[in-house]
Amino acid sequence: MTDGSARPTRRRITVLGSTGSIGTSTVDLLARIPDEIEVRALVGGCNAALLAEQARRLNAEVAVIHDESRHEELKTCLAGTGIRTAAGRQAVIEAGAMEADWTMAAITGAAGLEPTLAAARNGHAVALANKEALVCAGDVMLRAVAEAGATLLPVDSEHNAIAQSLGGCDMESVEKIILTASGGPFRKSSIEEMRAATPEKALKHPTWTMGAKITIDSASMANKGLEVIEAARLFGLTEDRIDVLVHPQSVVHGLVQFRDGSLVSQMGSADMRIPIAHTLAWPKRMVTPCERLDLAAYGRLEFEAPDEVRFAPLRLARQVLRAGGAAPAVFSAANEVAVDAFLNRRIGFLGIGETIDAALQAMDENPELRTLDDVLHWDARGRALAEAHILRQSGGLRNDVSENALNA
């Protein structure tokens, strides 16, 4: 006989990328269920003050900051709290490897690959918000998940919507899936207007509030391209079974077309706490403060096909998904370099797609990526190819020396 007064076991939680946009939304939800959780680790990038505030709020066991130059500031902020601190790349990986029942993997870019893999190898639930883990290292990640018996829970609103819309049905019943896109700030812009677009204009997303990198990705539709590749990995689908629809209201987040003709969708307000809460409470549901959707207030929902001429990254993403091998890793790496260059006014907005295309065209081979070292090698290679293109465009690198620069 069990004691009815016994308290349920607290779930052990780790948040990788707690100071980013997904991470802060996650912390907000965790702070609402303090009696149900035990926060093992919070990992941030360079914002020591925010990381310390989060660690105190959640009474975390350890706070880890990637930027080693901010470690002293973090220690000062947490002095006398009993919360341990650590810093640097290896400390971030070790935080990912800590035994936890649920890990939020929200470190963006290639920097998130190693800690996300470490979390998957624990064999528990990983809420995946790091696109690169599946885009660049899909085979490596899925193999680690399978070998450890882990559960991969998609956080991206579109993939989470697909998972909810499937409702437990097997993929043989699925004809295709449809990912939605807001269209970003340039949905109605001409090529000439997009060519002249500034970072300030590109950062004004019409419906979502996100970090700078993902906001620019949304504006270029590189984000949707990455999501097409990620969806193929997550759901085991070929490129021709993944459609994209532009839906400016951002109310419908994803749809599943079943072979019997049924079309099932997931809808909700544009608040990332909704998909995060779904992964946190899965297979149950939790109460959230998110705004409830009032469909009558919208009156009308719009859908249109994306323009893959103006939004070249989406077209290129489909090409690399069909090509396989190292191409997706090069696409992702080149996009990161291009977005950074655009934000720093080194290239124009359309230069993002041009840089990705140039990096892909410059690949002299396209091998399968079987290990993390393979992935990291081609990530670095993609960055070098992209940077070489940007330098050539600005007159800073001659064609005859570019290969030496890439192989340095």
Swiss-Prot record:
SUPFAM superfamilies: 1-deoxy-D-xylulose-5-phosphate reductoisomerase, C-terminal domain, Glyceraldehyde-3-phosphate dehydrogenase-like, C-terminal domain, NAD(P)-binding Rossmann-fold domains. NADPH binds at residues 19-22, 45, 47, 130, 132, 211. Its EC number is 1.1.1.267. It catalyses: 2-C-methyl-D-erythritol 4-phosphate + NADP(+) = 1-deoxy-D-xylulose 5-phosphate + NADPH + H(+). Its cofactor is Mg(2+); Mn(2+). Mn(2+) binds at residues 156, 158, 227. Disulfide bonds: none annotated. One of its GO terms (biological process) is isopentenyl diphosphate biosynthetic process, methylerythritol 4-phosphate pathway involved in terpenoid biosynthetic process. Pathway: Isoprenoid biosynthesis; isopentenyl diphosphate biosynthesis via DXP pathway; isopentenyl diphosphate from 1-deoxy-D-xylulose 5-phosphate: step 1/6. Keywords: Isoprene biosynthesis, Manganese, Metal-binding, NADP, Oxidoreductase. The keyword NADP applies. One of its GO terms (molecular function) is 1-deoxy-D-xylulose-5-phosphate reductoisomerase activity. 1-deoxy-D-xylulose 5-phosphate binds at residues 131, 157-158, 182, 205, 218, 223-224, 227. Catalyzes the NADPH-dependent rearrangement and reduction of 1-deoxy-D-xylulose-5-phosphate (DXP) to 2-C-methyl-D-erythritol 4-phosphate (MEP). Belongs to the DXR family. This is 1-deoxy-D-xylulose 5-phosphate reductoisomerase. The lineage of its organism: Bacteria, Pseudomonadati, Pseudomonadota, Alphaproteobacteria, Acetobacterales.
